[in-house]
């Protein structure tokens, strides 16, 4: 992961491409509207659209960052955003999440 990224597609385009169910009926509602459309400077700790699969694909908002199991403070999630692909499965901070807790970040 990197420190910032962009989302250039709208919710309808993403649902068509990835085939996920969505709880978002009005993408402009107060609760989640600003987080679902195109954005060009998405930063750590902001809500991001993800797709999970527990038997069916679901679109949902999640907070960007990783809070390792040993962390005493949730704020560490703002710093845990950069995993090297070659070592993520071996590093203690990323190992369990890498093996068991995956999602597609859109």
Question: Language-model features: where?
Answer:
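Short linear sequence motif anchored by a di-proline
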Residues: 1-106
């Amino acid at each position: 992961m990197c420190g910032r990224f962009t989302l250039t597609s709208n919710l309808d385009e993403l649902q068509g491409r990835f085939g996920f169910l969505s709880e978002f009926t009005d993408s402009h509602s107060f609760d989640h509207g600003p987080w679902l459309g195109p954005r060009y400077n998405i930063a750590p700790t902001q809500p991001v659209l993800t797709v999970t699969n527990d038997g069916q694909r679901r679109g949902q908002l999640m907070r960007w960052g990783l809070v390792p199991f040993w962390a005493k403070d949730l704020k560490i999630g703002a710093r845990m955003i950069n995993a090297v692909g070659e070592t993520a499965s071996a590093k203690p901070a990323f190992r369990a999440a890498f093996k068991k807790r995956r999602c597609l970040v859109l």
